[in-house]
C-alpha cells in the first residue's frame, strides 16, 4: 500500500466503530499495536496470552478483530485460535508474529486464522489486514 493510499484511508477509518483485541505477551508489541489501532480510531483492549483471550470471550466479550501473537506463555496463539473457533467465535483473527517458518504459519492458518502478517506491524500492514477481512467503513 502506498503512502497516498494510507493517507486516503485514514479519514474513512477514523469514524470507525470497529473493535479489536490485541493478544500479545510483549509490552512493546502491545503498545505498537494499540497505537496503530488508536490512530485508525479502532477501539481496542489488550490481553497477554491466549487463555486470557478465551476468558474474555467466555465472559461475554466480543470484538470485530483479534490480533493474535503466536508465541505466548500459558496458551499460545495456535491453541487460542483453535479454542475460539471451537467455541463458535466468528471474530476475524489475524496472526501477527515474528517467528514463523512455513510449517508454523500453515499450522497457525489451519487453526482458524483469517489473515497473517509478520511483525513488526505497521500502519500499512494493519490496513492490509482490514482490507483483506473486508472491514470497510461506509461513508
UniProtKB/Swiss-Prot annotation:
CDD domains: REC_hyHK_CKI1_RcsC-like. Pfam families: Response_reg (PF00072). Gene3D superfamilies: 3.40.50.2300. Disruption phenotype: No visible phenotype. Its main location: nucleus. Residues 19-134 form the Response regulatory domain. Mostly expressed in flowers and siliques, primarily restricted to pollen grains. GO terms for cellular component: nucleus. Two-component system major event consists of a His-to-Asp phosphorelay between a sensor histidine kinase (HK) and a response regulator (RR). In plants, the His-to-Asp phosphorelay involves an additional intermediate named Histidine-containing phosphotransfer protein (HPt). This multistep phosphorelay consists of a His-Asp-His-Asp sequential transfer of a phosphate group between first a His and an Asp of the HK protein, followed by the transfer to a conserved His of the HPt protein and finally the transfer to an Asp in the receiver domain of the RR protein. Belongs to the ARR family. Type-A subfamily. This is Two-component response regulator 24. It comes from Arabidopsis thaliana.
